[in-house]
Amino acid sequence: MIQFQPVLGSLKSYEAGKPIELVVREFGIDPDQIIKLGSNENPFGCAQPVVEAVQKAASKMPYYPDDSYLELKTALASKFDLTPDRIILGNGSDQVLDFACRCVLGPGDSILINRITFAMYRIYALQCGAKVHSTETVLHDLNAFLDLAKSIRPKIIFLCTPSNPIGDALFKSDVYDFLRQIPSNTLVVIDAAYMEFGKKKDSNTFISAKEVTDLFPNVFYTGTFSKAYGLGGMRIGYGIGSKELISNLYKMRPPFNVANLSALAATEALKNESHVESYLDNNLKEMKRYEKFAAEQSVEFIDSYANFITFFARKRGKSSTEISQSLLKQGIILRNLRSYDLNAIRITIGKPQQNDRVLTALNQEFS
């Protein structure tokens, strides 16, 4: 019998949002009538020039990409005003998070995370044999982080801001005050997958990748093309840090870890920032409709700096599982946060007509 690593006994695979195909099989609903607002994807998709560029380059599929990815890294370097050797690309930003864990953690080491946060931090750490410590608060509390950091001395601290899965955000000034109190030999990962949305809502939440990694060489800043840029299906993200950090992370990177068409799509997306701005405008406008609904129905929610909103189901008679299942039967895919030990649902902000349908359905559930 194969002897598997003991840590696998305590590991659970990441639970992704329900795909449209599964809902079709489960409920027999016409796929064209299904609204997928459970995985925080861009409902408008990527910019049309990105689609055209990928279609034009389809003949490149048989060939490996340029493993230096210099064109994309140069474009990102220009965007962030730094040099390409401070950037590493990944098959989604979660891959560069994996690089960081494997580069720093060993058996018996510790990480520090928020109680409610992106599940992959825990998974990657456990895969390395590390211990996972978390705060007790739902929202990020940097004082709680500091208290724990002093006692457990973690090798890595993860700050997800704006937060996945619930959308709260930290102010830049508070993050900088926190970083000044963290030992320089502790890696602090700032997961900025939703930073574009936070910046749009309140510039005080914006953390510059260049500035923070210049001031604090122990910071690793990660971002993605999956959310604001609408390239979730292309699986491409990036990490930014000091030259020393990036050069060591590269030792964990497999060859050709980003597909050539994905790299091309990301490069083209950076030339079409107006598409992103249009989406951010829609997100902010439509978010207010959900906030208005919550106020009218006395539904508790979390002030969100991302492209989704979290509604709590407590004191409403129905659980988050019942609500999400009821909407699923109507062809509306939301995210039930019960797996995070929250009696809450999370709704990706969609197109206006999609939100019309969701709000009508939610009115029936919460009234």
UniProtKB/Swiss-Prot annotation:
Family: Belongs to the class-II pyridoxal-phosphate-dependent aminotransferase family. Histidinol-phosphate aminotransferase subfamily.
Known partners and oligomeric status: Homodimer.
NCBIfam families documented for this protein: hisC
Pathway: Amino-acid biosynthesis; L-histidine biosynthesis; L-histidine from 5-phospho-alpha-D-ribose 1-diphosphate: step 7/9
Pfam families, per the entry: Aminotran_1_2
PROSITE patterns xref list: AA_TRANSFER_CLASS_2 (PS00599)
Enzyme Commission number(s) from the entry: 2.6.1.9
Protein name as it appears in the record: Histidinol-phosphate aminotransferase
Residue positions where N6-(pyridoxal phosphate)lysine is found in the record: 227
A single GO molecular function term of this UniProt record: histidinol-phosphate transaminase activity
Annotated signal peptide: none
Family annotation (HAMAP family): HisC_aminotrans_2
GO biological process: L-histidine biosynthetic process
Cofactor(s) the record lists: pyridoxal 5'-phosphate
Keywords: Amino-acid biosynthesis, Aminotransferase, Histidine biosynthesis, Pyridoxal phosphate, Transferase
Catalytic activity entry: L-histidinol phosphate + 2-oxoglutarate = 3-(imidazol-4-yl)-2-oxopropyl phosphate + L-glutamate
